């Protein structure tokens, strides 16, 4: 009985790694589309987001089977409950990468010019997503803590971009619609950073049994 349960736990681990890899792909693809002003790349984001949605349902069903059909001990319950939390954040990363791509597609023929700060923010966010997935793969608490700390950097980028864009709107320098679209894209990156942080916090819970909210 335990042998079968361990096999299913190993399957859960593999499925989460695959879903995490899809999240890395989708955010990298939407960011590349933004940087290169490439609508063909933006069109490839939605199918990946749909694949992430399917993976979320598959993992959720597997977790429910583990809970209902097996007899998990405390450490098993920790892994399963953390997995259920993580897939929610992973699914939202896919959604927000798709939201970025949708803005780019709606502006076909009127490409946005992403400034250096937004490109830096995109790179920082991609790194957070990648490292949160790596932290899960390696069950690495130190790396998870680095991801959590990096969220302040992404928030700082958002604050600077927001202040810059609001100033340009006030001065009538930019097209208002384009400026609002850039602000929305920056907000999506900020949210993706939040989801990567959540994933890292659940990795820490899975390994240590203590969630950040309980440690403060």
Residue ranges of model-derived segments:
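Cytosolic, long alpha-helical scaffolding segments
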Residues: 1-216
